[in-house]
Amino acid sequence: PPSYYAKLYARHNLRGGHIIKLGPGNDEAAAYALQEWPNHLHIGGGIHLDNAVSWIERGAEKVIVTSYLFPECRFSLERLLALEKRVGRDRLVVDISCRRRGSEWIVAMNRWQDLTDMRVSKGAYKRERERG
């Protein structure tokens, strides 16, 4: 169970380990794992504006988000800024897991099945850094 790994991470002082909820019925196990090493693990999977603070309160050091930021597979800066305002930049991890399409790398979500409108490149990274 996830709590086993949380205890293992705590024993070896591994900070920032990820708990990813991939499917329904994972909330209870994830919450239990967070209790095993509070404020040292990151949680992702179904994170959105209305539940992010709850996961921080349950013991997550940070929340990991992808799908919420891409309604209909299109990046929403407004959603990112709202989530950042709600939990704080230091508590937010934006997952930009990608799949290759031709010669490009595209941010993917929903278990890498859905490609978004965001391409990952040095230029895109530079633009986002300049924004803030």
Language-model segments: which ranges?
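N-terminal active-site wall of soluble small-molecule enzyme domains
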Residues: 2-42, 46-56
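Conserved anion-binding
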Residues: 56-132
